[in-house]
C-alpha cells in the first residue's frame, strides 16, 4: 500500500533540484557558507533549481530573528534561491500524516525508554518496547526498522559503509516532548520539494542511512547525496555555532566568497578580486568541478574562533 496522496508525489520532472536547509539556531558562519555555496554551485552547474528551506522545528534551539538574518546573509553573498522559502514550522500537518501512515502500516511503535536506560545498555536502542504495545502518553515514536540500509553511494566520496548497529536501530521519528524528529521532517520535505540531490556537510553522513531507510518505507525515490568537507578550526574542531564560530562578515562579500571557493578546491581566476559578486558566482558555476573538492580542510583564523 502506497502512502496517501498528500505524501506520495510521483516524480515526473527530471530537472535537477538542490537545496540548502539551515536551522535558525544562529547566523551563518564560514562552515555554513561552504554548504550553501557547494549546493548552489552544484545546482546551477546542472542548470537546476536551488531551494532554501528553514528547518525551524526545534524551538528550544532557535535564536529569535536568526531565520531572517540567514536569508539576508544568503542574499548578501549573491546566493539567490528559486521559489518561496519553505518553513518547517508550517509543515506539521505533513509530518503528522507521515506518522499516521507509518503507524497504520505497523512500521512504528511507541517507546517509553529513557535516555538513561539506553545509555546504560551502550547507547544503541535494543527494541525493548517493540512488543509492549504502549500508548502515546509520555512516549516517543520509533521506526520499526525492517530493512536497514548499511551503505550508500556518495557522489563525491564513493561507497560509505554505516555502523551496523546504528543502521539497524529503531530510531526516533517523533520525540517524547512532542517535537518531530529531524530524520522524519527532512525526508518528508525533501520528497515534497522534489529534491533530486542533497549536498550538505560531512557531519550529516551518519544519519543518511536512516533517511534512506525512510525513503524506502514510503516507497519514494532516493535522492543522490554529496557530503562536502567540513571547515575546521586550527585545533581540528568543526566550525559550528556551538563552538562560537564567528558570523559571516557583513562587509564586502567577495574575499569570503573567494576563500570559500578555494576551500572547495576550485581554481581561482586571475582577477577574481576585481569581479562583482555576480561575476564571481557566474565564473564559479561555469568552472565548477566536483572532483576538485577535497575531503577536509582547515580554515584560517579569520573565519574561525582560534580560541575554541
UniProtKB/Swiss-Prot annotation:
One of its GO terms (cellular component) is cytosol. It is an enzyme of class 6 (ligase). Its cofactor is Zn(2+). It holds the Pfam family tRNA-synt_1c. Belongs to the class-I aminoacyl-tRNA synthetase family. GluQ subfamily. Catalyzes the tRNA-independent activation of glutamate in presence of ATP and the subsequent transfer of glutamate onto a tRNA(Asp). Glutamate is transferred on the 2-amino-5-(4,5-dihydroxy-2-cyclopenten-1-yl) moiety of the queuosine in the wobble position of the QUC anticodon. This is Glutamyl-Q tRNA(Asp) synthetase.
